[in-house]
Amino acid sequence: MAYSTFAAIDIGSSCMEMVIYEISRDYGIKEIDHIRHIFELGKSTYEKREVDFEDVEKMCDILYGFSEIMKDYCIDDYRAFATSALREARNAVRVLDRIKVRTGIDVEILSNSEQRFIIYKALAARSDKFNKIIEKSTALVDVGAGSTQVSLFNNGTLVTTQNVKLGAVRISNMMSALSQNVANYVDIMREYIDNDMVTLNELFLRSKKISNVIFVGDCVPYYVRMKDYFDDGEYITRDRFKAFLDKIYHKSIEQIADIMMLQENQAKLILPSAMVYTRMLDFTQADAIWMPQVTLCDGMAVEHAQKTKKFELKHDFNADILATAKNISQRYSIR
C-alpha cells in the first residue's frame, strides 16, 4: 500500500496546532498525531494591529518544535497557514520572514474566503452526511476567532455566503474589560452581537425557510464534550442547545471551565460563540443541529489528498460557484 505523510499547521488566533496525517488511495485520510499549543495571538493583533516581538519569538519557538516533529515523522509534505490574527497585522510580512529564518517553515496567510473554503472541503469530505443534509435548505454557520461566516445551501448547492466580524476571540477581547466592571455584561454582549446578526437576518435570511443548521468552528470540539446533550456524538436539538446556553449564561469563566473541563483561556470563548450560534437558531426553523468536528487542518489534508490524486470529493464545487453567481446577478438585477 502506497501512502504519504502530510503535516497541516494552523496558526490561529487562540492556538497553534499541527496535525499529522497518513494519506493513501486505499484508506483515505487518517490522522495519526495532533499537537496543540494554546497561544492567544489574536489578543494583541485585534487590538493593536501588530504582532509583538515577544509573540513572534514564542510563535517561532512553537513552530521550530513542529519542524522537529515533522523530521521525526519523515513528513513527505506540509502546509502552514495563518488566519485572521496575522491577516490583520500590519507587520505580517516581517513576521513571516522571521519565521522562515528561525524555523525554515514557509507560512502562507489565508484570505477569509480561502480559509472558509478549505473548512468547507473538510465538511464535503464527509459526503454521506453533508450531501444528504444540504439537499434541504441549510445554514452552515462557521464561528471563527475573528469573524463568522454564514453560508446557505439548497438542493445540494451553495446559494449565498456572508461574513460578519463576530468571532469568538474578537468578542471575548472586546467584552473582557466590561466583565470586570459591569454587572450585566452578558446582556451587553448579546446587544453587541445583535447589532450585526439582526442586520444579517434582515438582508439575507429573513425570506429563507431554513430547515437544517450545521455549526462548525474552533469551539465545536469543546461543545461535544457535553455528551449528555448530544445524540450520536455530533447531533443536538434546538431545545438541548438552548438548555446548554441557559446552564452557562450567567456563569463566570472559571465556572464554565469547571463545567466543561476546559482551561480558562478556552472557556472564555464558549459564551461568545454559543450566543452567535443561538442567534442563528432564532432566525431559522431548524430543530436538529449537526456539529461535526472538522478543522482547517482537516481541510488542508483533503486539499493535499486531492492534489496527489489520492482522494476525490463527490461534491460539485463548480455548481456552487455558478449558483452563487446567479444569486448575486439576480440580487443586483444583472442580466
Question: Language-model segments: which ranges?
Answer:
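Gly/Thr-rich phosphate-binding beta-strand-loop-beta motif of the actin/hexokinase/Hsp70
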Residues: 2-30, 132-161, 218
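Short acidic/polar alpha-helix capping motifs at helix-coil junctions
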Residues: 8-10, 29-34, 61, 241-245
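Hydrophobic residues in beta-strands and at strand termini
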Residues: 11, 39-41, 143, 166
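Helical "lid/coupling" subdomains associated with nucleotide-phosphate turnover
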Residues: 20, 44-72, 85-93, 101-135, ...
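Acidic donor-binding segment of Leloir-type glycosyltransferases
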Residues: 98
